[in-house]
Amino acid sequence: YEHTAENAVVKEMLLVKFLVDSPVARTDALQIVEHFSGKTVDLTPTSMIAMFNGDSPKIDAALGMLAHFDIIETVRTGKVVMARGEQPT
């Protein structure tokens, strides 16, 4: 059975750790996180971990916008699915 956005809730989560080694880089990163309704879950003077939730195109776009930063590591869940309505998945 194929689950689609019409008959199921389909989401992914992405954690991305990257360097923010200047005030300008930090500001740019925070604007990208905010634009994609992400959340900063860890912040040090030189690095940041951002979390994004959403459908695959949104996650791909957020990661693409962060590509110009020095990315240390990423963790991505893949699709998590639950059928809409009363029917079990």
Describe each PLM feature range.
Residues 1-89:
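Long, contiguous binding/interaction regions
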